[in-house]
Amino acid sequence: MIKRTISGMIGKGSLAHNRREFFAENVEPDRVQLNICYQNENLKEVYKELFDDAVGRYNIGKRKDRQITNYYEKIRQGKQEKLFHEVIFQIGNREDMAVGTAEGDLAVKILDEYVKDFQKRNATLRVFGCYLHQDEATPHLHIDFIPYVIDWKEKGMDTRVSLKQALKSLGFQGGNKHDTELNQWMNHEKEVLAEIAKQHGIEWEQKGTHEEHLDVYNFKKKERKKKVQELEQEKEYLTAENEELTAQIAESRADIQILKDDKE
């Protein structure tokens, strides 16, 4: 049994990069044909598939100026939610699981197994883009998805974009500010990947197990960086929650004003 790290991180969501519509400096063009494209759908079309019926239900009885005409644009222009999210998974690094080596080929096999049940495990994360890249130093997986919730009982559409609620629907309730729904979900997915890796003779070498080998300065530096990342992630969640509440309050006030106008 060999030991390897397992990485799961939030990506920037560059669809053009994932689809290789351009080549970044770290991409080897002669290896692009090795990449595996599992899913490559048009984001706008998937939005129509997921939300058009909900938009129709929401607009019933609404004044024209209160109706939603394009949900994709509403999310794109708003600050409440992102159009989509991306996660990246990788086993090992360029030193021990490099592309073109037997170890790298094993990483590809494990990632391939892992991704095939991703959508089944995560029903409320609608995958529209999924790519396994082998034209960079280490094989890695990009998964682009739209998080959504159905049967929403509060203000707004009954089916809507919401990362927090999508993850709650999957059973990740969140805890303190360092134990958010996203953190819980990411850890769970890494555990799923680790279990598959174990079946192929790879044991998960979790970060922090070898900190005693770092000198004090490097250890503290690493811990500070980790803390900053956690705080940035928490800030993003709190901002999203605040904006969601603000939007609901604004919508309620607008409804009250409409009732007043109709009464007058």
What are these language model-derived features?
Residues 1-264:
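N-terminal nicking endonuclease/strand-transfer module with a His-rich metal-binding environment
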